[in-house]
Amino acid sequence: MLTQQLAASRSEDDGRISDMSFHDETLNNEDLSKIIFHNVQFSKCRFTRCDFSQSRFLSVAVKNCDFSNCNFSESFWKQVTITDSRGNGADFSQSCCKELTLCDSSFAYANFSKSQWENSGVSNCSFKESFWAEVRLKKLTLAASVFSGADFFKTPLKDLDFSDCKIDGITVSETFKELRGMQINL
């Protein structure tokens, strides 16, 4: 069903998929770039090496999906919830995330470099060995998440509360300036 909707949105030249639910879909190496997903729900879907670059996700719910190793570079996310899902190795570089909620999900080895986050929340997620270089974070709440081995080079962590998060082995600059003003438990 999703491939048909994708073809229809491309042929109509508006690149929009709205007010739909997709369940148990499997896509491999598909081009979903520059598509606008509005008021869409994905559940138990699997995307393998799909290209979502420059796509927009507006009022979207993602539950129990796997989008590992997909390309979401330069994508835009607003009022999106991702729950019980996997995005291991996915590329979210240069993305903009506003009111994004991530729960009970894994993003190990994912690339968030040069992305922007605002009014978003992360709860019980794994970001092991992920890349957060040169990221702008504004009003991000963190709870019970794992950032072991993550790279925060040139990403100010001021005002972020990592108190109940695991942050062993993270990478920052030689001056440790990224760590100024962050909260942790010792």
Residue ranges of predicted features:
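Tandem repeat scaffolds
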Residues: M1-L186
